[in-house]
Amino acid sequence: MATHDNTEHVSDATDEAVGWESKLRYFLNSDFVRSAPYWGIPFVLMSIAVYGGTGYNFAISFTDYEGLGTPDYSTLDLEMYAQALSSDAFIAAAQNNLVLLVGFTTICLVLGLFLAILLDHGIRFSEKFQTVYLLPMSLSFVVTAQLWLWMFNVESGILNLVVTTLGFNPVDWLGNPSIALGAVILALIWQFSGYTMVVYLAGLQSIPDDQFEAARVDGASITRTYLRIIVPQLKEASVSAAVVLMVFALKAFTFLYALVGRYRPPNGTDILATLMVRRAFKFGEWAYSAAIATMLLIMALGVIGPYLYYQYKQGGL
């Protein structure tokens, strides 16, 4: 009897070992493992450069590190965050960020929708207009900044040429703090309104023509048709375009730096990104800048996170 029991135990152990060997063999032959040489190295490098750098930045934001030597992790606190949140410069930069975020995104969406509706109606040369409107999107922030720097020039800029032709005095677009941020928003709108136009145009062309015909038969005006029937169906296009625009608004440092060629942008246009870089590279306040960078990351996650969660719930990820 004991011999029979031992035989059963040996048989069970053998079956279990064979099962594990089969699972291991299946795993080693899976596409995940076989493709590891192709995605593994990039993943490791990205993890070190991106996630490692982000983690290091987060860690030094709790210290008083000034860029020399090794950070002292013996006393970690929230002093840098407290200094930033109580600083007038930080609050002013955050307000400018908010104005840039809301103003730039809203106007781009409205203008892009208007242009998309015009092109969707099949106006003459619509394909050529579409190319012209989208062309600025292909330019880098540096090129756009230099182009608009010339256009904003007080003496020879094309904008002031128009202003003086109309009988008004030249405007110092970037030297006047009350309008400088508006000038920056104008330049960014010029660059990105074509992007929102293409997004909305794709959404409009996916809507069946039957809906337009039914609205026309019911006697609805063009304006009422778009406001009540068409625009509500562009919700997903609006959300996806808004997320992209807000992310670009948070990344406006490159544009502002290229506009003036230094860490200090025109008065009235300082944003959190320019403040962060200036305090780090000009004043050596690395821990303080790391705290600002962490808060910027939280803002970016606040923009992208809900969108990704929504896409996940809808099965889009």
UniProtKB/Swiss-Prot annotation:
Bilayer topology term: Multi-pass membrane protein
Transmembrane regions listed in the UniProt entry: 40-60, 98-118, 132-152, 179-199, 241-261, 290-310
Assembly and oligomerization:
The complex is composed of two ATP-binding proteins (XacJ and XacK), two transmembrane proteins (XacH and XacI) and a solute-binding protein (XacG).
UniProt xrefs under InterPro entries: ABC_transporter_permease (IPR051393), MetI-like (IPR000515), MetI-like_sf (IPR035906)
Name the job this protein performs.
Part of the ABC transporter complex XacGHIJK involved in the uptake of xylose and arabinose. Responsible for the translocation of the substrate across the membrane.
Swiss-Prot/TrEMBL induction comment: Transcriptionally up-regulated by both L-arabinose and D-xylose via the pentose-specific regulator XacR.
Name the keywords, alphabetized: Cell membrane, Membrane, Plasmid, Sugar transport, Transmembrane, Transmembrane helix, Transport
Spell out the family assignment given in the record's similarity comment.
Answer: Belongs to the binding-protein-dependent transport system permease family.
Biological process terms in GO annotation: transmembrane transport
The name on file for this protein is Xylose/arabinose import permease protein XacH
Does Oxidoreductase appear among the keywords? no
